[in-house]
């Protein structure tokens, strides 16, 4: 068990059950925009316990707020987290949290900037092949 306060942002069908099991954890429900950013920026580590997410954009949102990530070494976190720079991937999330505390928050912010919506859109467009309209020989 880790010391410190634990906050869960988000919601789901198990919230009532989990609230009863973890009385030392605050369950805040969904947060958006500036309010979400404020909560993330005020934290020490973002714990991403999922074993099944395919990408995990919430990890990039946390990094954009300067928050290092502690996650399992599975698809999603493996694709997003730079091990030892923006987060720690470990089967033991407690150990991952402890190690993530030592990471430089500015590295997290800088890395997240590489994956902003604008840069992602530019990358997507750069992979599109030009199409030739019917009846024309050259792409437009």
Language model features by range: what are they?
Residues 56-59, 77:
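Short glycine/serine-rich donor-binding loops of glycosyltransferases
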Residues 5, 15-34:
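Nucleotide-activated donor-binding/catalytic signature segment of Leloir-type glycosyltransferases, i.e.
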Residues 64, 68-71:
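Short hydrophobic beta-strand element within catalytic cores of glycosyltransferases
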Residues 101-139:
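A charged, aromatic-enriched C-terminal amphipathic alpha-helix characteristic of glycosyltransferases
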Residues 31, 38-43, 124:
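Short alpha-helical donor nucleotide-sugar binding micro-motif in glycosyltransferases
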Residues 51:
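Aromatic "clamp/platform" in nucleotide-sugar-dependent glycosyltransferases that forms part
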